[in-house]
Amino acid sequence: MFEKISQFLVPIAGRLNNNRYLQVLRDAFMLAFPLTIFGSIFVVLTNLPFLNKIMNASMLTSFQSHFGIASTATMGIMSVFVVFGIGYYLSKSYQVEAVFGGAIALVSFLLLTPFIIQPETGDAITGVIPVDRLGAKGMFLGMITAFLSGEIYRRIVQKNLTIKMPAGVPPAVAKSFAALIPAFITLTVFLLINVMVTLFFKTNMHDVIYHAIQAPLVGLGSGIIPTLIAVFFIQILWFFGLHGQIIINSVMDPIWNTLQVENLSAYTAGKEIPHIISKPFMEIYTVGMGGTGMTLAIVFTILIFMKSRQMKQVSKLGLAPGIFNVNEPIIFGLPIVMNPIIIVPWVLAPMVVTLVTYLAMSAGLVPPPTGVTVPWTVPLFINGIMATNSIMGGVMQLINLLIVFVIWFPFLKAMDKLNLAKEKEQAVQETAAQQNDNSIKM
């Protein structure tokens, strides 16, 4: 049965993993990763719960105002980095000049962005870009624009509709002239789109895409049922030896990252955090507990309660990496991959933990993640506190470890008995072989 399922899943997962556009999207978000880490660090520092006890109100306001710009300049305009990254990596995948692909994508996005702010009272302010258009609110338009502009740009380049300079011209100058016609045509397309939408429909592409595509998708992706489905497929893919995170996250990351940016914007503005499900939720309360499947609980269970020598050796090897959320020694050494004995807890435990965590946050027992990006190698409990800015975030992880322990224990016990029987049989065979060798020598 497992072989038939594997034969069905592996080709699909392979196509998803090798899809050009999903790879580009993943790389584009990783381009923004170090910048979001920088911004997140200062969000944590400016919102430490004890600051109001060591600073007066005026000093605290000044501190948050001066250092809070770090999150606005990174997480607050994340769409800018993603758009450039998509244009860059898409062009690179087609082996055309990547830097110009990124720059053209970014300008195409800006051409569709309204340079106007309408205050609640007073006249509109022109010549400025609302920051929210460059953050979560503009994410989906940015991605769509970047892919379209990248495709237009590379097709024009590949058709040789470029200006070719003499051989003696410096390479930088030659490349600039080569990109001139593709850039002009691509940018003209998006300029005309903006003109038509503005003149004939009295709106802008940001609002069109946000209301027609982004809001429905984000609303769907923030629900617990789609999240549980995503967790289910992540675990199933890992069971068959495929990297579930890379495959599923390449589809879900645009939604989860958008939710994260919206949460951070609300948090830094002092508003209620709107979403429970987001990228940090998925990383901290699934991967951030010893790696995929929360295997740190499995390691502790084996070391404390199991007797099999093989299982204990694997767990000892997996303990140190597991503290930093690296669990390949457990997945492939225990093994978990293609092991029918433990497919049930492997799939069930993360889904139960995800549901329990969601319900605890919905009930207000644990604050939801604030939107800060916590490096995935930060150990358990610490990453929970950092993600939620509350000790309850870490406590929730400890409770989740107990849940994983309860679900896994009977299955590990069964596996332990089987391994003990094999080890005893192997020991008997080795003893018999040694006695046989001794008798031959005598």
Swiss-Prot record:
One of its GO terms (molecular function) is protein-N(PI)-phosphohistidine-sugar phosphotransferase activity. Induction: Up-regulated by konjac glucomannan and by cellobiose and mannobiose, the possible degradation products of glucomannan. Repressed by glucose via the carbon catabolite repression system. Also repressed by GmuR. GO terms for biological process: carbohydrate derivative transport; phosphoenolpyruvate-dependent sugar phosphotransferase system; polysaccharide transport. Residues 5-411 form the PTS EIIC type-3 domain. The chain crosses the membrane at residues 28-48, 67-87, 97-117, 138-157, 177-197, 205-225, 228-248, 286-306, 329-349, 365-385, 391-411. Keywords: Cell membrane, Membrane, Phosphotransferase system, Polysaccharide transport, Sugar transport, Transmembrane, Transmembrane helix, Transport. Its main location: membrane. One of its GO terms (cellular component) is plasma membrane. NCBIfam families: cello_pts_IIC, lacE. The EIIC type-3 domain forms the PTS system translocation channel and contains the specific substrate-binding site. The phosphoenolpyruvate-dependent sugar phosphotransferase system (sugar PTS), a major carbohydrate active transport system, catalyzes the phosphorylation of incoming sugar substrates concomitantly with their translocation across the cell membrane. The enzyme II GmuABC PTS system is involved in the transport of oligo-glucomannans such as cellobiose or mannobiose. This is PTS system oligo-beta-mannoside-specific EIIC component. The lineage of its organism: Bacteria, Bacillati, Bacillota, Bacilli, Bacillales.
